[in-house]
């Protein structure tokens, strides 16, 4: 009686915990996770700051085209005023001077304009890099999202396996008591049940780790829920079309192309160092002294021009020019290499998607056959027509089939996003939405600290879990 009361209290407590968790947990779809992750990720902030740094570099380059204004002032105090033999003052008692100076220096090759163009191209490159970083990050978020769903499914599969082996254990125990089975069959059942409990513990911890990783990556609260979405399996994979899309839309290719243009502009900038530099200056000066001499001039305005041509610098300019040419060649080679790698990446992503799409149907059939086989073998075992080994083989086949279907399903959804990323359309896909994606109200997975209890409650296995007795 006391045992039943304790069992009821534990069941009520677990139900209360589930209800409380459901009341406060926030639900997220993949797209909502995307948005939250982009707004809170430190990696995205770093990439955005790179754009800002590039903008500041352009401001610095622009400053070279604007004259520099300098204000100055001095005050001198002497021990005494002095005069020469002609009674002309050569040293006042004190003097002061102040004024404003404007300076502008530029190269006759206009290399300052080249620097400004390079800075503008650097902004475009940083923006392309930001978009590509977003694509990388969104795919990482999707991978973590599906890892959580996969871990939850794995936990459910483990619980179902634990339920089957518990039922089998009790059945073996009953048949052993009536002399139909030997002690070795019971020991085998106990061993399999213990292994299932170990798998359950591993699956529970794997789910906690996957949830923690998603929380770290996206900034969602720990007691979140994920709303699974059903993705259509009718997506076609046109490799040639995807390659053209990648060539036109991939921002990493655009970034490398911009890097090539910047390298070419850098060659022009380095070549400009061989040209003379011109300096212009204009000065307004005021002065005061006490006592003031007869020839003292208290105000003057003047300007000037200078021409500088460093004809020998130990080979520095030639080395810088050759270095710029080498970097230009490197940039072109890197761009060509990336284009070839993109073609392979698109083909690999497309073939992976087709493989998963084709194998998923066969794996689902295998799962159906494995489940029917297990049910048939269990009935035969109950009637004494099958051995313990037959049951274990059937259960192992069903367990493997369940895991394979889950892995293939979520890997397919991730592969679909990988194809979009490799073709350069992932960002547009996330912004615009996908009409093929529909919310599935029946696929809601609660991911809280009591998620393992919820899995049992939803499957009607909570009471059975607390009633397992191996004595």
Indicate where each model-derived feature is located.
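Bacterial N-terminal signal peptides
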Residues: 10-19
